């Protein structure tokens, strides 16, 4: 694929010392996102999604290119992924859609055992007071797809007692993790289902309804 070759050509040219700086890596990936994305597609995606998404930019970078970029970052990170943890923090602060998608892939695939880190704790600390459902589900789905266990009951209850955005994230985790075959106690599900959602929020209402349906099947 031409766009993948273009990305490979771009990455080959990078100085290996770039991996020592999360700031330089953040600049590098921002430069890499548009590779292989036609300008008209970029403009169309931005015009269509920007107003309601909460993202600072949307370029339309294909998922496969983001995965290739994440693989290159992890492969060249050396013996520790601590710089990549700092990069994840920078990506969330910049908050382009490609930033959040790349952060999700990185978060799911870093060596958390070696660093003594917990991906769910990192995600909780990364999110902004207002986030789109898309940005949260990108991360939740990526962690579950990578076979990461869902948050513990204690972590889930902490989310439930937190700010609204964290409460809403706990609902999404229950739903997505249940679809991936994980089981939660009835007590925990009842606690999470007691969360109040904004009137007229059709997405969260549907998620609540689907959780109820899934519970009825067990």
Language-model features: where?
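Alpha-helical scaffold domains
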Residues: 1-218
């Amino acid at each position: 694929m031409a766009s993948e070759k273009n990305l490979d050509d771009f990455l080959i040219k990078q100085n290996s010392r770039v991996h020592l700086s999360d700031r330089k890596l953040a600049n590098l990936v921002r430069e890499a996102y548009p590779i292989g994305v036609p300008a008209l597609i970029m403009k169309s995606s931005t015009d269509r999604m920007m107003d309601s998404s909460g993202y600072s930019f949307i370029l339309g970078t294909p998922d496969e290119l983001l995965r290739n970029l994440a693989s290159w970052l992890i492969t060249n990170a050396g013996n520790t992924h601590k710089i990549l943890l700092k990069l994840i923090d920078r990506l969330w602060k910049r908050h382009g859609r490609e930033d959040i998608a790349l952060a999700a892939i990185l978060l799911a695939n870093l060596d958390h055992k070696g660093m003594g880190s917990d991906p769910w704790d990192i995600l909780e600390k990364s999110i902004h007071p207002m986030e789109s459902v898309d940005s949260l589900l990108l991360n939740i789905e990526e962690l579950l797809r990578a076979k990461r266990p869902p948050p513990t009951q204690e972590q889930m209850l902490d989310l439930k007692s937190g700010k609204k955005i964290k409460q809403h994230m706990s609902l999404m985790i229950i739903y997505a993790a249940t679809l991936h075959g994980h089981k939660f106690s009835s007590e925990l599900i009842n606690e999470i289902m007691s969360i109040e959602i904004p009137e007229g929020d059709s997405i969260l209402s549907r998620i609540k309804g689907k959780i109820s349906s899934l519970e009825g099947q067990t």
